[in-house]
């Protein structure tokens, strides 16, 4: 297993533990479709959250928040739409969030990254 993959998996583990501590329940992890991958799909109350997890060892290259590009955001949005369609989830409240982890700092939960 490559180092980046191991770090990404550790970041997802930390993000999931954080979200669970906030009352979220895991529905799916590393969900794939033709449009891309959704790192975590969780339920928080009556809302489904589609979560992009970003991990960086440090703030080099502008930090972790800068790593979600417009093209990545578009892929995430298309993946979310496909997930909802495939699971016949209509009129279900949902949101696209991110959990950002930099080094040993506590995770930062950014809600509604689509604005």
Swiss-Prot record:
Coiled-coil residue spans: none
GO MF terms, alphabetically ordered: nucleic acid binding
Signal peptide: none
InterPro entries membership: Restrct_endonuc-II-like, tRNA_endonuc-like_dom_sf, UPF0102_YraN-like
Bilayer-spanning residue ranges: none
SUPFAM superfamilies assigned to the protein according to its UniProt record, in alphabetical order: Restriction endonuclease-like (SSF52980)
Stated family: Belongs to the UPF0102 family.
Protein's recorded name: UPF0102 protein NMCC_2054
Species annotation: Neisseria meningitidis serogroup C (strain 053442)
């Amino acid at each position: 297993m490559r180092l980046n993959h191991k770090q990404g998996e550790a970041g997802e583990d930390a993000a999931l533990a954080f979200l669970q501590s906030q009352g979220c329940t895991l529905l799916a992890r590393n969900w794939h479709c033709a449009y891309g991958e959704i790192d975590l799909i969780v339920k928080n109350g009556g809302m489904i959250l589609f979560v992009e997890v970003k991990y960086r060892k440090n703030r080099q290259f502008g930090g972790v928040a800068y790593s979600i590009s417009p093209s990545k955001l578009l892929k995430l949005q298309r993946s979310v739409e496909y997930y909802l369609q495939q699971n016949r989830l209509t009129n279900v409240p949902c949101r696209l969030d991110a959990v950002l982890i930099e080094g040993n700092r506590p995770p930062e939960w950014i809600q509604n990254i689509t604005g």
